[in-house]
Design a protein with these regions (language model features):
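Bacterial N-terminal signal peptides
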Residues: 12-23
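An acidic-aromatic
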Residues: 86-138, 204-205
Length: 238
């Protein structure tokens, strides 16, 4: 169970990549026919170097609020977890990610406050905290910083059209990253789906709804104070 929680947490960090896409309310229905990253070539694949929907959006997102559904499968395609959650982002470098599993469990909360990354496991009454630069250095969440050269950290390639969506493949440039690739599906300038794969072959499929882009986010929504009585592991950066 604890291992599954950390899978959700790690995939939650990857999901922050999606906040750099173009958003509107609504989401496409899940499909088992999304393009394989190894098939991102051919007649339907635009030339590498052509600006993607993800490229076009990176410059103008300030805040985002959305709910999402996430399905986690193992390397054999078997479903091992299904959950719903909420995501709030304030660029640069702040977000709140909360997820509630289907069935038992009270869920987890992850907050980046600009200095530290906090992870609250309500079932264990435990908080883990790390400096944000160390915690996110090898994840797509670096895209939140707004200060890095995205093309140096991630390779973004048009991956063709399928199921009515234009797909963008995102791959880490460095070997130290703990994920293999992310596929983002766009309908015009609207991000509809995201598929994430880690180095163990586990895959998360994410769809989004009730999305508000560049709306107001109160400071306390991307801040964290440990609840009374919980164990705190780690030392926050002041």
């Amino acid at each position: 169970m604890q291992r599954l929680k950390w899978r959700r947490a790690r995939l939650g960090l990857w999901a922050i990549v999606a906040v750099c896409g173009v958003w509107t309310a609504g989401a496409a229905s899940p499909s088992n026919t999304a393009p394989d990253a190894n098939q991102a070539t051919g007649a339907n694949a635009p030339a590498v170097g052509k600006p993607t929907p993800l490229d076009r959006y990176l410059d103008d997102m300030r805040t985002l609020r959305a709910t999402f559904q996430q399905t986690l499968t193992d390397a054999h395609g078997r479903e091992i977890d299904r959950a719903r959650g909420t995501l709030i982002v304030v660029r640069p470098g702040k977000f709140s990610w909360e997820i509630h599993p289907q069935g038992n469990g009270t869920g987890q909360l992850m907050v980046a406050d600009g200095r530290n990354l906090w992870f609250l496991d309500r079932d264990l009454q435990q908080v883990t905290v790390k400096p944000i630069d160390a915690a996110l250095s090898a994840t797509p969440a670096m895209l939140l910083s707004g200060t890095i050269d995205v093309r140096r950290s991630f390779k973004m390639t048009p991956a063709g059209k399928r199921d009515g969506l234009d797909w963008v493949l995102v791959e880490p440039q460095g070997a130290e990253a703990d994920f293999r690739r992310a596929l983002l599906g766009f309908d015009g300038d609207e991000l509809k789906r995201m598929i994430l794969e880690d180095k163990l072959g586990q895959t998360a499929s994410v769809i989004f709804d009730h999305v508000e882009r560049n709306g107001h986010v109160a400071p306390e929504e991307v801040a964290f104070v440990p609840p009374p009585g919980v164990d705190v592991i780690g030392t926050p950066r002041k």
